[in-house]
Amino acid sequence: MDKKFVIFVHAKEDEGAKAAHALLYAQELHDAGIEVKLVFDGAGVKSLAAFASNTERPTHQLYLKMKELGVIAGVCEFCSTQMGVEEPIRLTGIPQLNEINGHPSIARYVLEGFTPIVM
């Protein structure tokens, strides 16, 4: 299958269900054999920090699975710093993306054939 998707997660702190669904959609696409990547940007960097640190939540296990599978492509370096989650993000070992003035590049993914989804 030639379809590829990149999900940019911008869900705010009070939109945990939206961020969790990004993980679920990524898992579904991956399990169906469709290439998928997750990029946490904007307020979504706080969601990533929460997935990593809230070990009692079901989303933590899904986060770990997506990380292990290499589905999580990265997190915005600028936003991680500005939103005060730079240290928790650094501890995840997930690449910090900074191609466009400290932010991840959506064009890079489009040029690689990915269809973007923004949540």
Language-model segments: residues:
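Short, glycine-rich nucleotide/cofactor-binding loops
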Residues: 6-20, 47-53
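Histidine-anchored nucleotide/phosphate-binding helix
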Residues: 18-33
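Short internal beta-strands
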Residues: 26, 36-42, 73-79
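Small/aliphatic-rich secondary-structure junction motif
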Residues: 30-50
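Mid-chain, well-packed structural core segment of small domains
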Residues: 55-96
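C-terminal structural segments of small proteins and small subunits
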Residues: 86-112, 117
